[in-house]
Regions:
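An acidic, phosphate/nucleotide-engaging active-site surface
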Residues: 162-214
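Acidic, histidine-bearing metal-coordination/catalytic regions of metal-dependent phosphoesterases
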Residues: 1-73, 78, 184, 188
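Short, flexible loop/turn elements at secondary-structure junctions
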Residues: 75-81, 193, 204-207, 268
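Core catalytic region of metal-dependent phosphoesterases/phosphodiesterases
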Residues: 52-183
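Short, flexible coil/linker elements and helix-boundary hinge sites characteristic
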Residues: 6, 21, 45, 148-149, ...
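N-terminal short leaders/motifs
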Residues: 8, 136-150, 238-252
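Conserved beta-sheet core of the metallophosphoesterase superfamily
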Residues: 106, 197-201, 206-272
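Short, flexible hinge/linker loops that cap or flank conserved catalytic cores
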Residues: 64-65, 194, 258
Length: 272
């Protein structure tokens, strides 16, 4: 009887979530966030083992003696969706491509990637098929890739739909075709700019919160996975937000207390 009660409760919860627009695939994706700690376990062979390092001092990118660079993340574009603002996306890409010392990191959901398991009308609300969405993404990003403007790319919950169904990540295809770093579920990057070094952690995001505080809480949770980063980047929630805080540490050589500022950036969306 107890097992039947639990089963009925689970069915009721799934029904409510479906009515709220949360698909079963989205629920599975949220579990991926819960598994981030397991993914980073030392015994996990698939855990990230090395950060992607970029020098902006004339070694890899940019010209020597640069004091700063600009990073404009791209994500939640949903190419293929009937309400995707493709022209605005093209304008962003043009700016990144033509502006000196400006780069991007692709944080997922670049395509709509609707399947028969998607919530609502799903595939009936897209303008063209998944293979066309992938090809269009490749062609739109190609000019940036040729100029080494894309520092990494990862999947989002929309790409996760085909990953779960057929073990195919559209963003891995894009990365391989364009020769850009594939970050997987979580991205670690090191930027050397002038005499400074910045550590960055990226994740598409998995929050369904409708409040600013809830969304900030979701990106702050990334500190439990990636410690002592300078910048945390996240998308998914379709609302732009920014926050910062200060963390203190001890210099092991001098014993002095070191203050370090951490930045939290949540990007928006290009759905009309």
């Amino acid at each position: 009887m107890a097992d039947q009660t639990v089963l009925n409760l689970e069915d009721a919860v799934k029904k409510v979530l479906t009515e709220m627009g949360v698909s079963q695939t989205d629920l599975l994706y949220k579990k991926e966030l819960d598994k981030l700690q397991d993914i980073h376990d030392l015994e996990n062979e698939k855990r990230p083992k090395k950060a992607h390092r970029f020098s902006f001092n004339g070694v890899d990118l940019a010209e020597p003696n640069k004091e700063y660079i600009s990073i404009i993340p791209i994500h939640d574009i949903h190419l293929g969706a009937i309400n995707a603002n493709k022209e605005k996306f093209k304008a962003y890409l043009k700016y990144i491509c033509e502006t000196e010392d400006t780069y991007t990191i692709a944080l997922g959901d670049l395509i709509e990637n609707a399947t028969k398991c998607s919530v609502g009308l799903g595939i009936f609300e897209t303008e063209y098929h998944i293979d066309e969405q992938i090809e269009e993404t490749i062609e739109l990003l190609r000019p940036l890739a040729e100029k080494k403007k894309i520092l990494g790319i990862m999947p989002g919950n929309h790409e996760y739909r085909t990953m779960k169904l057929v073990s195919m990540d559209p963003m891995k295809i894009v990365a391989d075709r364009l020769g850009i770093p594939y970050l997987g579920w979580s991205g670690y990057l090191i930027f050397e700019v002038g005499d400074q070094m910045y550590k960055v952690f990226c994740f598409h995001g998995a929050s369904s919160s409708s409040t600013p505080a809830g969304r900030l809480n979701s990106i702050r949770k990334l500190r439990d996975v990636a410690h002592n980063m300078d910048l945390y980047l996240m998308g998914h929630v379709h609302r732009r937000q920014y926050d910062k805080d200060m963390v203190y540490d001890i210099d092991e050589k001098t014993g002095e207390i070191i203050a370090k500022k951490r930045h939290y950036v949540i990007g928006g969306s290009l759905l009309s």
